[in-house]
């Protein structure tokens, strides 16, 4: 097997709302994720179908404590360094900096927390990769404006960006504007703080919010380049190929349209203009975007420097209603199971070759450097009586995907900046709110009900990934 580039950014990725905890400490304000409960009410709230803008005593909220990285970050980053991380992707919690989302002055305690975190990364030679907004909308702005449906969210976001760019310009080189921006259409409350009134045109609201996020992203890219010459700002897509279930032309067409829909946001962020097909589709659907005169120029001038994406699985599309089957945990839905692939315990198809296909699709489409910022296997781990955790299934999954990455680099010639596995440490699942759906190399003693000591333990995969990084991917055994 060929080697990876010497400057390849190996590492792991987390999100503030899934790992930090301390939701009401250090001056932090309430965010949308803080009111998304665990249990049967979780999905109605995530999808904007049930209004919940405050916490109550009847629900458990996983993000409130999460894995308490707010108080454990030095221990956790030391463990990342032990594995040899060269890069750590994390997000800044908007409301830790601006508790109400648009405060005139930032919360100094929140700024100081990230100063300390970045300094800890730098101490070990770990490059931070920062997501500016990772499923994170201030509750105060949702109450005030209705989330990203309102144009005023753009200015609030850019104000937030201006603060963190100026504060961390000497500590952070790599930035992402929005996490999995395309998930706004599928999880509108999580992705954009959207709530829908009875009779409201939901598609109009979602695409209006999408336009506002796209304009905000472009303005952030432009601002970052002004404040931090030489920095790199990327977009972030929930990626994964859509395969036709059969070679029937209708299935092939359905898969092609699903792929095109999924790349809509990145088309705009990378090319600086709306694709013609998207304009026609909105026209047919009666969607009329409210825009401002300089929006086109803003989008054109604020294109991203690289394409980052998450990849967990591919999906299989058919128009045959008898073959349709909803895959558990597949938020995009509308897919049938692929008979040629095994699936995880949560119904996600395991498709390493699909990663290589996706990488080639993205590079052929955009001709920009790529960065895989999420990839991993959610699984139930067992702690043995001696405290060991044998997660060979996770090693097998990651090995197969890294092998395909190497082929994409050395055989296909693709420029790949780095690879950050999702959840290098166990954390709260964004979709289900579970802790038992574990991704990490590091086990965290906590269960779905919030019980546990929060003790950190190394799994077998910890030592395996350490070896992978040390050999630049040459030793995957």
Regions from the language model: what does each represent?
Residues 1-57, 81, 100-102, 111-477:
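Active-site region of glycoside hydrolase catalytic domains
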Residues 65, 69-78, 99, 110:
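Internal amphipathic alpha-helical repeat/solenoid segments
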Residues 72-93, 302, 306:
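Catalytic domains of carbohydrate-active enzymes, especially glycoside hydrolases
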Residues 92-106:
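Glycine-rich, proline-tolerant flexible connector loops at the mouths of alpha/beta enzymes
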